[in-house]
């Protein structure tokens, strides 16, 4: 199978499974993020891919060749990968161009070829004018660019990124996200990106693998992950959401105070009994007057809390009938006082049943 | 429970049989062989000599069979037992003296506004550079019973014919031993004083404690572990020292262990008995260091671990000159006076004639450089051995420290233990071990530079290891992982990244080894051959021949070369490289 394949991958430290039964197939040229809270096993997974940690179960293969297995692994230096580290790990004893040339020199390329490639990649990351500087003379963002250049210049089989932006300030981080995306689009390197920042993962990735407690929760495109979360963890970790408990039966889901026909919601549901759904704050609309819309669920109630976040309002709406509370996002022009009566419309197509 | 129908994260992996084996040639890292090689070196340097030492102490010299006779012979004579108890007594008194010298100086230089702090610091550093046996010679020139300068001044002043001071006495022995080693107390205790954050003392002040109470209740308890550690090391240094007893304890008729050991090594050669007799020295050292570990492990003694914050300087007022007076006395006794008389003697026709222009000459230097049979070669040999020992020890230690810090192999802790274990072996005992293991046929390295270089490397491996280990710990592992993921092995990472990053640390460690290695006496004494004498041994020969002026000239030359090397090092490393070590 082409690409990078993790098969039932597991790593145990003492009595703790840091990673367990992790299956993942990354196609050639794909950019996949491992996203999860700290301690979820994403960095362990990445370091297993790099070869710094051996798995205790399962295997890793690249283009059909086994790289890692509990019985032994190909060492990192023989994998033809490259990596961008959290600390950048730019060698302070070498200049920018020496840092970038290091991997090429290890590959015993002729020196004019090395020079040409280093020049070209420094051009790409806009660092040509600083080629002879030492790392101590560079800013954090510039060091990050050097790390990026050093990693891509060898045209690695797989590029691994270990929270590369976590040491940068917010503005720079935003800029570097697009930089990384741009580099990927330009070189089409199979990439695995570890982060706990969903924004980073959303911008850069073709697909995001959400991890929790050493296991894969869901892998999907950023849009699918946001609009169709499959588990409670994914729904709450990616963006904000409302969880509602209901009961499923007779082609309807019954919630406190209202019911939705199964046919109207976007997902197929089989069987019956208790069910949990996720409704994003953006899947609802608040209005001051009763203006029932076709195919929408209309609830009457009032605004209980409000906070202004700049790009949106964050309201808490409480239904009069059931007392249920909803977080609702509204554009800045939709101003409601706390305590004001309001009507809520929910788009049933955006109600997503989830597994607990 | 309702089941939401979505496909499991992926199911395709179940379809395919999993073959999990990476071919061995892909798994092979050439570096792994290096680790094996290093373990082999440590066996040669440490395990084999020490094992041979212990085994030969139980071996019958004639039959080669097992025996306890060596122990009977070693401890059967009252004289031999006296030497043991004398050694312990001397060690105890030396510790008291070294602390009395080192602790006040360390406090004065780090925590007070005493004038001349840098002068005191440099002078103490001079004590590090001057080998103890040269200080001993200096004091023989100063306080020899008949011709010592102090006594001659006393005779002419008082008309008495009795000496005022006599260096050939128990007092002389402990004084000279103490001045030759108190710099270690100074270094350890000053760095402890520098680690204390003044906020700890401020906290006591704000609660109502005065300066004296604060010092007694807060400051000194915090440096106590350093003082205890320094005291133990002082004791071990004192009982293992060879040069000073060789000069003083024989004329003083005060037999000590090291001198007794040389007796076993003179004709008739009794290595097995010497081995048996050196075992207590080894056991005492091991026990002392074990004791230190035990004391330091106790809770409450761990507070001096933080990074030093801002330190408050104690304003001494009028007392600053009193303290300076005391410090001056100590550095005068330990460095200035012996160094001065040594230089003067080196340039004198006859040191007993006192100072006059007619007495000045360069002939002593000419003699040791061009006429004497072995001193010129010895200078080259000593400096060369110093360079080789420092370089090999640092290189070896860097690799070992790397393996240990990065936990590359199972039981890497054992490598660390081996690398620091020569610490508990006094130089003279190490020499006996090397003699027993490698001097005689079939290996027959006796009298070669090789056996001395090996022994010196072993002797200084602990310093090298401690320095390298701290250095490696300060390097982020990702620095090396970046090398490896780009296709370089661990050895490449060591050569291109770890090594260059540790250049300064390693150079500092190199100097800390070079200085004592170029002067080393106790390890050399049993290993030198007729054609491979080192300066320290030639100096002792000259002292036995009574050629003190020529001895002084040769000693000065050695000092000048070492000072030059250290000066170059300090230019490159900054002057405080020695104090930064803890």
Predicted segments, located by residue:
Chain A
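ABC ATPase nucleotide-binding domain helices that frame the ATP-binding cleft
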Residues: 43-46, 146
